[in-house]
């Protein structure tokens, strides 16, 4: 059914989706936990950090699945509850994704810079700026320019790490594995590949999409 709706096989294999039953793909436990906690949110509260990234469908490390991050609304104290990592109000607003209030995607990137390494952050950034082949409402979550402007802010914890990761974010990587492959290729001294590259036969027949390509060298990955 998903394929009939235009969802690609690559998207169905993405790491942010789980398989509770054969033939069923759904968002992982982070989004489920947020939905369960939603009735407890106070006016102005928002999901932030790892939880917000999970709601956005970003590829998260396994250890993050058990943490629910909630940032308090203006004038409210940080949430205190077992299983919840409460954060004091920081004056930032929220956006709604899947009916849940979360930090703005650019803010999520900065929040994660205090917890994740550069490679993990790049994978998050690639997800945020991705333009899916099949249009999805609200995607991309932000542009490369918007992410650069967010990271140009000063005086924030781990801003150097955020900027280092932001400089490596590219449009076209649809999974964490694709991000890591690109980074490994560049680390090995190869030039940056073109991402999500369409290939056509000599007669113009479409052959398929490839994760990485070096067209001048006639190399596809």
List where the protein language model places each region.
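Short gly/ser-rich loop at a beta-strand->alpha-helix junction or flexible surface loop bordering the NTP-binding
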Residues: 1-160
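Surface segments flanking catalytic/ligand-binding clefts of nucleic-acid enzymes
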Residues: 43, 132-221
């Amino acid at each position: 059914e998903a394929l009939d709706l235009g969802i690609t096989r690559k998207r169905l294999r993405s790491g942010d989706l789980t398989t509770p039953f054969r033939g069923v793909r759904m968002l992982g436990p982070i989004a489920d936990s947020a939905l369960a906690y939603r009735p407890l949110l106070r006016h102005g509260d928002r999901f932030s950090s790892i939880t917000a990234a999970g709601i956005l469908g970003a590829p998260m490390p396994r250890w993050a699945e058990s943490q629910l991050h909630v940032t308090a609304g203006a004038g409210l104290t940080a949430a205190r509850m077992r299983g919840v990592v409460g954060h004091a109000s920081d004056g930032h607003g929220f956006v709604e994704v899947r009916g849940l209030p979360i930090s703005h995607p650019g803010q999520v990137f900065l929040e994660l810079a205090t917890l994740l390494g550069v490679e993990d952050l790049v994978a998050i950034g690639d997800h945020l700026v991705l333009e899916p082949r099949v249009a999805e409402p609200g995607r991309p979550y932000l542009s490369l320019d918007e992410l650069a402007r967010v990271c140009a802010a000063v005086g924030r914890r781990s801003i150097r790490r955020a900027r280092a990761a932001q400089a490596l974010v590219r449009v076209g990587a649809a999974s964490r594995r694709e991000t890591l492959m690109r980074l490994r290729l560049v680390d090995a001294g190869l030039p940056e590949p073109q991402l999500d590259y369409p290939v056509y036969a000599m007669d113009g027949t479409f052959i398929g999409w490839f994760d990485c390509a070096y067209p001048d060298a006639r190399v596809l990955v």
